[in-house]
Amino acid sequence: MQLFNGSVHTCYSYRRHQYEQSEEYLAKLQEEEQVKGVFGRYVDADLSTGKIRDYEIPLTWYQKYLGGRGIGLRILLEEMNGDEDPLEEDNIIVFSVGPLQGTGVAGAGRYAVISKSPKTGSLNDTYAGGFFGHELGTSGYDGIIIRGKAPKPVYLSLVDGKPELHYAHSLWGQQVVDTENALKEKHPGVRVASIGPAGENLVKFACIISDRNRAAARPGFGSVMGSKNLKAIAVRGGIQKSLHDAQMLAEVRKRLVQELTTNADIVAFGKGGTASCVHVFNDEGLLPTKNFQEGVFDGIAAIDAGTSADFKKLLVGNDNCTGCPVRCKLKVDGEFKGQAIQAAYGAPEYETLAALGSNCMNDDIAGICYANQLCNAYGLDTMSTGVTISFLMEASEKNLIDEKINWGDAKAIVQLIEQIARREGIGDLLARGVDYVAKELGADFAMHIKGQELAMHDPRGKRALGISYATTPRGANHMEALQDDGAENLGKYGTPEIGVYGPIDRLAWKDKSRYCKKFTDLGSFSNSAIVCTYIGWDGVLLMDYNPYPRIREALYATTGLEIGVCEMLSIGERTFNLLKLAAAQQGYTRDDDKLPERFQEPLPRGMSRGEVVCEELLQEAIDDYYRLRGWDRLGPTDQKLSELDMTEFIGFIDRKA
């Protein structure tokens, strides 16, 4: 097949007969009435050859893994052998949605991206909100599989059910807002997920940005897209799913919105979003400060959206995701040293305020907002960026580098972001990630786990978080972790899903392995259903609200699958074990479940003064966690896989080796 033989704008020819075959398959799937709410297929685009086909999903995969993360991981374990380099053409990247995307259910305006991570070297996943996920959920497909590497920059459009590849030469080098504007002009009504210059330049922690300010961040998938010469994906849907019970779904949607808009905790959260939570962690003495050397930041009053007068002057409103009345995404407008801060890029979330603020000793809120804007424009993960810069500041303080980079220097932070994205000067070194930089400098204070920079949560005052950090195959990821401070409310609000019937002391080790497993399974289920963190498990943790009965009702109305509490947790456990199987394939073992040595240093002040992670107690808890999981030192045993109805993976781990 000859490349670039289409029109001026279309790189690869469009093969209609493939879609006719898929339409017959889709009709058959819906006639069988076994699983509604799905299209039963993914776009499968090979950028090396230019061929686009449909990838049909077995019904049993939906029944076992539901969607989102689960289906994406199952595809990759089917199609990859583990030898792939994350930034070479044999890696595969999957954009995936679940049954609820495209239905308008509050909290379901999200999508998943799954691939082999240049940060951890294993399969990993990330999520973003906004409107792209909803559009993909009405596209006629449940996701998009990208293989190979295009000979020239391209983008993929999926408009009215028809996927096509187009030249993207004019878009290469553009920041994400410019890319989005150009694609919306060319394809009216599309939603766009794209990379900026950081992804093009293969920065290890480059991310994917959709809707201008929603980041699919952490594992470095912006660089995976860049390595494939894939600039963007533009989707316009409008294709309705076949629902099990449309009337019931409408009633559940209405009831969920009513509950969200009348819950005082959720309404308050919507006004300030995560940016109003910074002081909470500071009060606990657990706000990452000075590269995690401290847990209290003296400049806290300047960077919390709820307390900072300067922050409030920058705020210009709130934004939402598809179908969600909470509207927790803040917008800012202003300037930093003569540079415009634009509302289109959104306000910094908690993680960004900590990573580029307190952890760098930076209390210049305008500087943080502008740094956040640059990260979104260039397509950089703000957490990894902040952790890497704070490491550099400490290295400078300890005279490990020639450059003088002072703590709290907002201007220097902005300059370093520019250098990282463009891979200029010292930015070329930093672009490789904090683990690489630490090895080059011979430093032992890099804050990462399995190559992934730390999230902005300190396990010295959260025992279950430490277990999760150490054991998750995702690296230093907090998004499925039990946040012990929030768990002190679990008994108050009641959470039968994870077997909690009384208050949990954040500093106690007792039962934390069990809580960690249950909560991780709950979060893993949420990531297969793809429901918002803050309506999902954070609703359980932080607010007087348990959304999971409504989520299960919505899934039944959509799919016809009766998912009780036990099956909900089983779906989560299955999908989490897919991650563990992939990690075992890459050689990860029980020996790799470690935390940075800094967490054995006591916090110097604040409510958590003197707290450390006791290595002996942590290792005992991890042993208990492995026992509860049914894992040996390599991963899930064959007995556990059989219990989870994952018999196709028996023998997947080579225990003889």
Can you say where each PLM-predicted feature lies in the sequence?
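Cationic, low-complexity basic patches in intrinsically disordered or flexible, solvent-exposed regions
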Residues: 3, 19-21
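Extended C-terminal regions of large enzymes
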Residues: 22, 184-219, 225-657
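Protein-protein interaction/assembly regions in multi-subunit complexes
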Residues: 22-222, 227-301, 582
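Basic polycationic patches enriched in arginine
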Residues: 15-16
